[in-house]
């Protein structure tokens, strides 16, 4: 070993001794800053080495492989091979393997070869392994032979070669997992005890990852690492113990509502008290870590002190467990992307069909749509293909005034209804689960964006109807098309606007057919009997499992009504009134269920969407500046009788 390499080896050894020392003492010495500078220098040097400290480099290079690996969906290679082995030991007539089984066998081996080839190209240590080269060459040879000779002997040869190949691969995967655990522990210690800027930590991780582009975000790196780990774990499964998972509904019920009676830090302390830190068999109780993981991933709100306590808990008790490396990645993402609320992953609460009784819709809206013969043809919309409104909605959310030509209602009602539906659906799907219960405490949420779009649409319907009285029939056809598309939010905005006093006092002439349609659409969103008709309609849509945009303000109103109308604690004051929060969680579960379906078979023109949003913004600005505008325009049309 050269003097330079020996110096680096001593430095690394000193670093690990130092880590162990300060972890035991729980105190920091005065040379902490120098120590982290030394870590930076050592890690930078490691990038230049080919043979020395290869485990650290292998941990990273073996995981950040080509993104093509993520596109290969393999169920479980070992299970596939085992099934093939069992099936081929059964007697077959003439010793011929059925074509379907043979094709499945070829596909499984091909996917195994493709996946491992991606890793081999990116990982020098794997590339230099003669055992892997020999095992791969033998498997490749037997696989080619399988195409020409489809007898049982050829199949068993491939099975045997595949198992040998997997056996050679397994130690490398174990090394990746072990090295990654060490890497994560060091990063966690750096975050906990290093008095450094978070951007410096990000740059350090990117340096270790071998990324030249420092714009490559840390959370993307960690997500990529975890994706590859999951992939390799499926490809080469190891026998890990299964941890107990809390009920999805019970977890959501607690994590959605606990802030009504306690704080984030108080909840964490209660959870940590429930964790058996003295018991050596801590792995037998995984309910607490699992609940914390769900909390961090799906129900988190800004609380940096609590997040540091969770990181400390992970570092002290969970770092040695492979299944909790994802929790570490989640914590780091929240450290870097500081946001009031950030849903890293959706945990579905679950709602059974039995909880919502199926019934016939009070209004057969599909037949009603056919009766009024709405024209559904629009060549421009169909030619535009898949519609991506994300950039347009981002500009709209930022309050940018979209510079467009004046939007005239010359598009078909069907085309306008599709545009409204896709805009409303995009916003509704972006609502994070926790927003449904915490909306009343925060501003600038996605729910606020949904309300803003509804208000802008209401103002636009009101203005265009007052200025051009003949458009009332047009808007009724748009409303009917929205109902047919199950966009109940836009339907409510349009029908409510058309019932505004400023319009009704004009006594606009309307044909009998349109008036009949107006009366039938009014019933759907009428508040009579607590919106009975609307609720029966949405339940029918729920069971149809079709995409839908619900009347969002009614969802929030229901949650607010339950929260404000019921006591948080029981009458004796000793227990939390869980019946109240069960009702809230069921409403959120219902709202979340409706987010699982997307509109994939309808499209709209981006030009139409941009023009519509621009026109609605301009009109709504007029109504914000003058709250009496609608009445003033109405008076100008038909003066009051004196």
Swiss-Prot record:
InterPro entries (alphabetical): Ras-like_GEF, Ras-like_Gua-exchang_fac_N, Ras_G-nucl-exch_fac_CS, Ras_GEF_dom_sf, RASGEF_cat_dom, RASGEF_cat_dom_sf
Gene3D superfamilies: Ras guanine-nucleotide exchange factors catalytic domain (1.10.840.10)
Listed GO CC annotations: cell cortex; cellular bud neck; incipient cellular bud site; plasma membrane
SMART domains (UniProt xref): RasGEF, RasGEFN
All copies of domain N-terminal Ras-GEF, residue ranges: 224-339
Protein's GO biological process: axial cellular bud site selection; bipolar cellular bud site selection; Ras protein signal transduction
Domain of life per record: Eukaryota
The Ras-GEF domain, residue ranges: 412-640
Subcellular location as annotated: Bud neck; Cytoplasm, Cell cortex
UniProt KW keywords: Cytoplasm, Guanine-nucleotide releasing factor
GO MF terms, alphabetically ordered: guanyl-nucleotide exchange factor activity
Other remarks on this protein: Present with 2110 molecules/cell in log phase SD medium.
Complex and partners: Interacts with AXL2, BEM1, GSP1 and in haploid cells with AXL1.
Protein's job: GDP-GTP exchange factor (GEF) for the small GTPase BUD1/RSR1. Regulates the activity of BUD1 together with BUD2 which is a GTPase-activating protein (GAP) of BUD1. Required to produce both the axial and bipolar patterns of bud site selection. Determines the orientation of division axis. Overexpression can suppress mutations in PRP20 which is the GEF for GSP1. May be a cytoplasmic GEF for GSP1. Might also act on the Ras-like protein CDC42. Appears to bind to Ras proteins but not to activate them.
Protein's name according to its UniProt entry: Bud site selection protein 5
Upper classification of the organism: Eukaryota, Fungi, Dikarya, Ascomycota, Saccharomycotina
Gene (name only): BUD5
